[in-house]
């Protein structure tokens, strides 16, 4: 017998024996009612009846309240319990939820338990069938009276009493509380089937704290009978029998017997095995076939169990094969129960069937042999029909009726229950064909079959489950997981597929041939077919499958090349139009732009815009582009390519004769949606990455091409620009594999943009492991083998998308964090090293969104990016210059690796003689950085005007060719945004704040530089003095008495000047506007959540939303969508400026508050651009809050200087002194009203940033 653990105690059942998870809590269930094959439950609360239930996910035995003994004997860290939890965001009433005990603070027990339990609440409530549950990171403190102990059925069943179960057992694991793990499921199966056959109603309830299967009659409903009927199942001489017991619930006449039944050891061994490898006692009609050869997929060290059923009946086998929906969760009683009475060779009472039981220990020692053999002696037990001797005559359940005919409705009801039992009781086993198993997985061993023995020596093989195909179909009984060796072979197979794809697709692209094929798709297809036929002639041994695969690849390529937006003309007409005629186009309102000489259609009518829409007004910050400045030619008279803009003035939407010979003809639909600065940047990208916008003049091997930078203001449409460029670039260079790297917050935006613009290019998004486990996207499907774990699934998903990325022209998108994880060189896993190798060598084009982030010289991410083997790069940034010229140099080198060479050629006079020397790349980069800082940076930083101008000119001459800069009005569209007003509020501190800030400032004056701990404390104290208590370093600078006084100020909003301003502003505008609050730290966000809840009675998740770095990708997307929802209930969004200041759109907000200042001005600029961007319908007001006389003033002056340097680098005109950017005036009516009503003089100075602000 299995030894009991000390924590497994037996307990009587609760008067309400079950509990179900509904409406966010576990509710007590009085009884389960089974009628006509359906199961319903009656709740204790309000007597409500539930009929649409998931019994194996949300139903279990009711948990019992914890006692004083449980604290000492059972409760410990690591076990699962049910706790009473206060969930503020959903309901004010506490609810019962599942949790895990993390730690226990033990205290001496007196009259009651005073111990404190730290528990972590599960996120996935009501899903007890999950193997792994997600837990909330924030622990919850509960007491013993708020804990309930989980319960499960005990292993001992009553066989001769009116009750079936007497006790329940304590359970320490949430997964083990499932009702389908023990012997309760076979009983439930019998009750459901019997209720359909004979219209009997059962109730599973508690009587005298014992579980009873009560049979409900009319007398019970009327209350005229004092006795009740209950059903129980017993075993007599190896025969399973069901019987009815009459009992009086008013008298407890049934006493427990001290004598326990003795059960044969072999049967117990079989019954104790897990349900996935064994069957219940009364369904054990089987025998074990010896193991045989195993392939690499077998689950070491386990073997497949193969059940053999001996039968004397041919028609019985046919009956079983006709039913198509049998599942392993329902066993032999159903087959006995549903036998057809009128069959020619019906079931005979005199004939007996056999259960062949094999000793478990001997089964492991069996050798692999062909055929059927036994290595141990078998014990044979007589087994008669299960339901023949059931003594239920008063209910009409005799043997003849049970073996009677079965109607179609009955089979439908049984099939309905069988599907539910298979779904929730056990993972449904998938069926595969033998050919798929052998070809895909290399399976060599036989598949588990069921051998039905006849009286003769021959045997017949068929499957236990009734298949939809051939009746001889075999079935494999699989384990839950694969072995480590199987995982490795499965991953190796994916990596070999990538290698074969790279070898097949890694060929150089002929630009001229590709362009001619795009211009004349028909001839291109003919040439491709000719090349295909030549290859087939050369290789006489090419299989038919390879030919079909090649034809499919050609069709896929043709479908991609033959875009619906392109004009399709035959070869003869094309040559006639291009060679024999000098076209003179005129507009035909039915056809389009037609040549009046030859009739050639230059532009279809669907691509011609209306006359009133051809000329759109374009607004920029500094000047208008004159028509005379735009050149309509591509090549000058000398045959040298012109570097001027090539968009025609007459109509930007209509391709001219010259445009049909350049890349604009590749994206006619997208071109109409691009704005002027995007069109200039589009040609800029082609010239830097391909050498020209004319395919005939492109030279991919030229030394002049290289990486480039697109530095457009935030919100100017950089993402759409790159998407349009990639759509055209992959048509000319299908073998270039673009890799897009972006911050985690912008991955969702990239994916939506591809869908929004209907780009005909496949996009493969590589998730991080944690994001993949939480996402609903499961692209990998496995047939015939157990489903791998989440980690292996994530690896296979990455490898599968990388293989598709190589197989056809497509885009691979992933986050910087995932890229850095895969690029680790010290990984011990072979697949990690392989993926790192592929990501280094395969990309033909590297796109770095927000590429200014990896700018540090020591950054591991930057070092990994520099190792990517391609010079073709696009770096996107709205704020290119960050902190200093060293980081600026690193950013330019990241975008254009050739920049190192260009700097040395320009600045190092000795480099010309030493360039033949082969030096390491990092040494050359260090040398170039030194010259860049010593010559250019020093000249720009000097106060001498002429020397500064010289340095700026040198920098522009070196970088203007590969940097495209656009400083518009904050909008990337042709629509003019309503306006932007930026105010800097220099605020006075309250008395308590002033005392703390003065002390911290005095301590900082004794240090050289800015210690991080002091900087953090000053930043927090400037918002509210209580926030210093949230840090771990506060005890270093404040004594316990001071901290005690500070603790009392938590909920006093008047003690913080910034807090008072935020509450006043929100109070005045909340009814008509939404507010976006940015903060560098998390502690102020939590404080403001509590203040908003107390002052405005708002709730988190409804009016209050938070966007921080700990949220996963999809959760961030849901928060953004909820805040952007028109007419939604959200009012305030508190966001972390570090995690959420880039790449997202929050145009629902028209008021932006910056609680603290940043060292990097680009962060503030990016944060403002979340609200002030295309789609904004209101004037945006920005409030930068600074505390007077503190470190925040120094940070603000430093960031202003950085903005000025950045303006000088990219502006060709004179940039005025930063002191002239500010003006002491207020044009905001709300702000003016707050200042007028300010009685405590919170504001020292209010300045408006005239340079950054726009009209509004």
From Swiss-Prot:
MF annotations from Gene Ontology: ATP binding; chromatin binding; helicase activity; hydrolase activity
Chain segments annotated as transmembrane: none
CC annotations in GO: nucleolus; nucleoplasm
Subcellular location: Nucleus, Nucleoplasm; Nucleus, Nucleolus
Segments forming domain Helicase C-terminal: 1061-1222
Sequence motif DEAH box, residues: 849-852
Biased composition (Basic and acidic residues): 278-290
Pfam families to which the protein is assigned, alphabetical: Helicase_C (PF00271), SAWADEE (PF16719), SNF2-rel_dom (PF00176)
Annotated region (Disordered), positions in chain: 269-290, 448-467
Residues that hold ATP according to the record: 712-719
Domain Helicase ATP-binding: 699-898
InterPro entries reported for this sequence: CLSY/DRD1 (IPR044567), Helicase_ATP-bd (IPR014001), Helicase_C-like (IPR001650), P-loop_NTPase (IPR027417), SAWADEE_dom (IPR032001), SNF2-like_sf (IPR038718), SNF2/RAD54-like_C (IPR049730), SNF2_N (IPR000330)
Consequence of gene loss (knockout): Decreased, but not completely blocked de novo methylation. Probably due to a partial redundancy with CLSY2.
Biased composition (Basic residues): 451-463
Any one GO BP annotation for this protein: regulatory ncRNA-mediated gene silencing
Keywords: ATP-binding, Helicase, Hydrolase, Nucleotide-binding, Nucleus
Function: Probable chromatin remodeling factor. Required for the initial establishment of DNA methylation and for accumulation of 24-nt siRNAs. May act on RNA templates by remodeling ribonucleoprotein structures and thereby influencing the availability of the RNA to polymerases.
Assembly, per entry: Interacts with NRPD1, NRPD3 and SHH1.
Family to which this protein belongs: Belongs to the helicase family.
Note in the entry: Associates in vivo with Pol IV but not with Pol V.
Protein name: SNF2 domain-containing protein CLASSY 1
Organism: Arabidopsis thaliana
């Amino acid at each position: 017998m299995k030894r009991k653990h000390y924590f497994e105690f037996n307990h009587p059942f609760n008067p309400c024996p079950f509990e179900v998870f509904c409406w966010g809590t576990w509710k007590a269930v009085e009884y389960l009612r089974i009628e006509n094959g359906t199961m319903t439950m009656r709740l204790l609360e309000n007597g409500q009846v539930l009929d649409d239930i998931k019994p194996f996910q949300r139903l279990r035995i009711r948990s019992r309240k914890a006692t004083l003994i449980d604290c000492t004997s059972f409760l410990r860290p690591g076990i699962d319990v049910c706790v009473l939890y206060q969930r503020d965001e959903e309901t004010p009433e506490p609810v019962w939820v599942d949790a895990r005990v993390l730690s226990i603070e033990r205290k001496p027990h007196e009259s009651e338990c005073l111990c404190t339990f730290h528990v972590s609440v599960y996120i996935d409530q009501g899903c007890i069938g999950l193997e792994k549950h997600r837990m909330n990171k924030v622990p919850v403190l509960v007491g013993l009276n708020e804990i309930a102990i989980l319960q499960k059925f005990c292993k001992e069943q009553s066989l001769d009493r009116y009750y079936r179960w007497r006790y329940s057992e304590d359970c320490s694991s949430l997964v083990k509380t499932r009702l389908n793990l023990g012997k309760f499921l076979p009983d439930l199966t019998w009750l459901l089937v019997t209720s359909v056959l004979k219209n009997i109603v059962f109730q599973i309830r508690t009587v005298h704290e014992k579980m009873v299967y009560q049979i409900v009659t009319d007398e019970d409903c009327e209350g005229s009978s004092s006795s009740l009927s209950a059903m129980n199942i017993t075993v007599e001489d190896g025969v399973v029998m069901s019987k009815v017991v009459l009992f009086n619930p008013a008298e407890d006449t049934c006493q427990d017997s001290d004598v326990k039944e003795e059960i044969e050891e072999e049967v117990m061994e079989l019954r104790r095995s897990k349900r996935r490898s064994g069957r219940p006692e009364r369904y054990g009609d089987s025998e074990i076939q010896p193991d045989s050869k195993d392939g690499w997929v077998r689950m070491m060290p386990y073997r497949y169990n193969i059940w053999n059923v001996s039968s004397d009946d041919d028609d019985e086998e046919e009956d079983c094969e006709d039913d198509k929906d049998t599942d392993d969760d329902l066993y032999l009683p159903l087959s006995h129960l549903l036998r057809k009475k009128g069959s020619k060779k019906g079931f005979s009472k005199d004939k007996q069937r056999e259960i062949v039981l094999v000793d478990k220990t001997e089964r492991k020692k069996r050798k692999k042999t062909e055929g059927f053999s036994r290595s141990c002696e078998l014990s044979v037990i007589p087994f008669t029909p299960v339901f023949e001797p059931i003594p239920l005559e008063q209910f009409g359940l005799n043997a003849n009726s049970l073996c009677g005919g079965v109607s179609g409705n009955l089979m439908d009801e049984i099939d309905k229950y069988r599907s539910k039992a298979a779904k929730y009781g056990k993972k449904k086993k998938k069926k595969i064909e033998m050919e798929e198993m052998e070809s895909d997985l290399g399976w060599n061993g036989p598949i588990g079959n069921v051998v039905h023995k006849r009286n003769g020596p021959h045997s017949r093989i068929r499957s236990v489950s009734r298949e939809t195909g051939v009746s001889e179909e075999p079935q494999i009984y699989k384990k839950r997981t694969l072995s480590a060796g199987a995982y490795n072979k499965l991953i190796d197979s994916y990596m070999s597929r990538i290698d074969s794809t790279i070898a097949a697709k890694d060929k150089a692209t002929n630009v001229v041939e590709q362009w001619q094929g795009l211009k004349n798709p028909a001839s291109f297809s003919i040439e491709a077919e000719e090349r295909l036929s030549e290859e087939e002639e050369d290789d006489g041994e090419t299989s038919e499958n390879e030919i079909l695969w090649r034809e499919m690849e050609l069709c896929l390529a043709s479908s991609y090349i033959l875009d619906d937006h392109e004009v399709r003309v035959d070869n003869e007409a094309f040559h006639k139009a291009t060679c024999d005629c000098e076209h003179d186009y005129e507009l035909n309102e039915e056809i389009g732009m037609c040549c009046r000489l030859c009739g050639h259609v230059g532009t279809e009518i669907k691509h011609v815009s209306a006359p009133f829409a051809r000329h759109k007004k374009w607004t920029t910050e500094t000047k208008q582009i004159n028509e005379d400045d735009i050149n309509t030619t591509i090549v000058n008279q000398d045959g040298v390519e012109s570097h001027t803009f090539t968009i025609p003035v007459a109509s930007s939407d209509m391709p001219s004769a010259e445009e049909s010979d350049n890349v604009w003809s590749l994206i006619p639909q997208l071109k109409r949606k691009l704005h002027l600065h995007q069109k200039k940047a589009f040609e800029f990208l082609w010239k830097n990455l391909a050498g020209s916008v004319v395919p005939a003049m492109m030279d991919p091997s030229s030394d002049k091409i290289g990486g480039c930078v697109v530095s457009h203001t935030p919100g100017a449409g950089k993402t759409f620009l790159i998407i349009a460029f990639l759509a055209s670039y992959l048509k000319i260079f299908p073998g270039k594999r673009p890799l897009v790297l972006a911050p985690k917050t912008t991955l969702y935006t990239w994916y939506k943009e591809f869908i929004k613009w209907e780009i005909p290019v496949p996009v493969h998004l590589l998730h991080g492991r944690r994001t993949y486990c939480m996402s609903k996207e499961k692209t990998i499907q496995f047939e015939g083998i157990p489903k791998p774990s989440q980690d292996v699934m994530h690896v296979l998903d990455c490898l599968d998308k990388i293989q598709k990325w190589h197989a056809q022209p497509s885009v691979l998108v992933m986050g910087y964090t995932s890229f850095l994880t895969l690029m680790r060189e010290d990984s011990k896993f072979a697949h990690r090293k392989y993926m790192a190798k592929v990501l280094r060598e395969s990309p033909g084009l590297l796109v770095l969104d927000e590429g200014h982030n990896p700018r540090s010289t020591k950054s591991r991410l930057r070092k990994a990016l520099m190792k990517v083997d391609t010079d073709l790069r696009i770096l996107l940034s709205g704020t290119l210059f960050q902190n200093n010229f060293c980081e600026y140099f690193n950013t330019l080198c990241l975008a254009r690796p050739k920049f190192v060479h260009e700097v040395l050629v320009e600045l190092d006079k000795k480099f010309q003689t030493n360039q033949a020397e082969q030096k390491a790349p990092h040494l050359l980069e260090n040398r170039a950085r030194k010259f860049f800082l010593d010559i250019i940076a020093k000249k720009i930083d000097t106060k001498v005007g002429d020397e500064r101008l010289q340095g700026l000119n040198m920098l522009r001459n070196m970088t203007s060719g590969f940097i495209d800069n656009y400083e518009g009005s904050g909008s990337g569209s042709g629509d003019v945004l309503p306006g932007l007003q930026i105010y800097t509020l220099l605020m006075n501190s309250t008395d308590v704040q002033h005392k703390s800030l003065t002390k911290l400032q005095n301590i900082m004056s004794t240090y050289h530089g800015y210690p991080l701990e002091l900087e953090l404390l000053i930043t927090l104290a400037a918002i509210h003095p209580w926030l210093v208590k949230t840090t771990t370093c506060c005890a270093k600078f404040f004594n316990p008495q001071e901290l005690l006084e500070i603790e009392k100020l938590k909920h006093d909003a008047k003690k913080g000047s910034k807090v008072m301003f935020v509450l006043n502003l929100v109070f005045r505008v909340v009814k008509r506007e939404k507010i976006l609050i940015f903060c560098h730290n998390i502690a102020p966000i939590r404080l403001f959540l509590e203040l908003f809840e107390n002052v405005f009675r708002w709730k988190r998740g409804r009016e209050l939303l938070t966007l921080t770095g700990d949220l996963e990708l999809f959760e961030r997307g849901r928060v953004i969508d909820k805040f952007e929802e028109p007419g939604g209930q959200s009012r305030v969004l508190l966001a972390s400026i570090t995690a959420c200041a880039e790449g997202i759109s929050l145009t629902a907000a028209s008021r932006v508050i910056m609680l603290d200042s940043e060292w990097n001005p680009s962060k503030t600029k990016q944060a403002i651009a979340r609200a002030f961007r295309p789609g904004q319908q209101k004037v945006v007001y920005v409030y930068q809050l600074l505390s007077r006389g503190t470190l925040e003033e120094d940070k603000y002056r430093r960031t202003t200087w950085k903005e000025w340097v950045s303006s000088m680098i990219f502006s060709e005109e004179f940039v005025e002194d930063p002191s002239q950017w500010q003006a002491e005036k207020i044009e905001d009516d709300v702000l003016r009203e707050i200042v007028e009503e300010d009685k405590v003089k919170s504001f020292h100075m209010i300045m408006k940033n005239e340079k950054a602000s726009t009209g509004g």
